[in-house]
């Protein structure tokens, strides 16, 4: 592992093709789980076998080293990973509403990190991505009484925002400003309210 160094160009390919950049980061932060090893190996093989732009011999050698290191990590860890854990739970959740970039997921029972919540939502990018979804938050408009919270250092690859009327009990959440309501003929239904989408 001492000979394997973080490669910005390789990371750029992972980001460009929406692969698992968080798992690649974890390999060098020494926090690599079995899932991370699996995803790193999968991404390296995918880049070498399926990406036509991935032709640089040095990058291909790096991908081979990543795949080898990750496969060694998998062999050394005998725990079995269920298929469900390898799939992104945000991608699997049905969307309550969608905008151009974002997906709104209804949370009927928000208990982790909040109390007294009666109306709650997850907001994430429609496509699996580690990009910050807060930059597109103006695509939604919410009624008063709801607040948005974001963890800047989320462990998950698919970043998300929690919008709720609950009270946060964890200090890990940063409150972010929701956009001001604006009149429109197009609506997103949030709870019992009709909320305009900003186009």
Swiss-Prot record:
Keywords: Host cytoplasm
A GO-annotated cellular component: host cell cytoplasm
Lineage: Viruses, Riboviria, Orthornavirae, Negarnaviricota, Polyploviricotina
The protein's name: Protein p2
Protein's cellular compartments: Host cytoplasm
InterPro entries recorded: Tenui_movmnt_prot
